[in-house]
Curated annotation (Swiss-Prot):
GO terms of biological process kind: cell adhesion involved in single-species biofilm formation
Gene Ontology CC annotation, any one: pilus
Name of the protein: Fimbrial adapter PapK
Additional record remark: Strains of E.coli that cause infection of the human urinary tract produce pap-pili which are hair-like appendages consisting of about 1000 helically arranged subunits of the protein PapA. These pili mediate binding to digalactoside-containing glycolipids present on the epithelial cells which line the urinary tract.
Database matches in PANTHER family: FIMBRIAL SUBUNIT, FIMBRIAL SUBUNIT ELFA-RELATED
Organism placement in taxonomy: Bacteria, Pseudomonadati, Pseudomonadota, Gammaproteobacteria, Enterobacterales
Native organism: Escherichia coli
Length: 178
């Protein structure tokens, strides 16, 4: 059916003596995805333990660190030996450079610090993990351990203005292989 319809259309165009031109667009996307992000690392939720707002009124004005891991798995053999860097991206809190901005009743009063894979260095949004060096893929999987904590802004500490209520922040991460 398709062949005969095509032949009929071709015949009609030739017999009318007109040429018809039309564009055909082709698109594609090539990815170099040597490792897959594990399902438990996609759309990850880091939940901070409930704390009294007054815990953020006095120095150091921060929560304990919550640990989390980004897991890479099913790394293709061509990935072994490559360096993978992970970069978190998100809106920074103006009063706490290098910290994520929170939304909710304490916006502008709290920020979220991300800790690098060494467990102590601040990992600023837009910078790559492991002090920019990344991590070498050495096998089929790789675990990247991070931490996060909530901290009051200097102004919120000074004025004791952190109040009870929910807060949240969102960051995305990007993986680059080289």
């Amino acid at each position: 059916m398709i062949k005969s319809t095509g032949a009929l259309l071709l015949f009609a165009a030739l017999s009318a003596g007109q040429a018809i031109a039309s564009d055909v667009a082709f698109r594609g996307n090539l990815l170099d995805r040597p490792c897959h992000v594990s399902g438990d690392s996609l759309n990850k939720h880091v939940v901070f333990k409930t704390r009294a707002s007054r815990d953020f009124w006095y120095p150091p004005g921060r929560s304990p660190t919550e640990s989390f891991v980004i897991r890479l798995e099913n790394c293709h053999a061509t990935a072994v030996g490559k360096i993978v860097t992970l970069t978190f991206k998100g809106t920074e809190e103006a009063a706490l450079p290098g910290h994520l901005k929170v939304t909710g009743v304490n916006a502008g009063r709290l920020g979220i610090a991300l800790l690098d894979t060494d467990g102590s260095s601040l990992l600023k949004p837009g910078t790559s993990h492991n002090k920019g060096q990344g991590e070498k893929v050495t096998g089929n999987s790789l675990e990247l351990p991070f931490g996060a904590y909530v901290v009051a802004t200097p102004e919120a500490l000074r004025t004791k203005s952190v109040v009870p209520g929910d807060y949240e922040a969102t960051a995305t991460f990007e993986l680059t292989y080289r």
